[in-house]
Amino acid sequence: MVGPFCSASVCIDLKGMKNGDRTGFAAYNGDSGVLTVEKNKGKKELVMSEQYSVFGDNQGVKVIKEVKTKEMARIPLKSNRIYLRIDGEFGLGKDWATFFYSLDGKQWNRIGEPVKMVFDYRRMFMGSKYAVFNYATKKLGGYVDVESFEYK
């Protein structure tokens, strides 16, 4: 993610998801803002959450003790294709990521609240980044197709 302003979007085909699968798009810099499509009991939902690390000390070394999740929004999803977008604003005193979704790639809906992208070189990462992900929580075999990634 590059300032003072940037925007990235992905189009994901969800037809191959199995129950328990998770896929999505995130902005992270130690703490994260995450758009996740979850499939459970044959139904898909889009979840917007903030994930943040709780640090501790292990013999003088800073370590992550746990990662906490704050869910900000959850909506049912009937489509087998979704567009996810994250806008970054890195002006003086801003450092925000704002999250959007679309079912057609044209009309965008904001979801959740902006997430502060905390820049702290002593923690995890130098600079905010985008991430596209897909994983199983129950059984292997599901998949998604990332049809596009656009960055401005």
Region locations from a protein language model:
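Extracellular glycan-recognition regions
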Residues: M1-K152
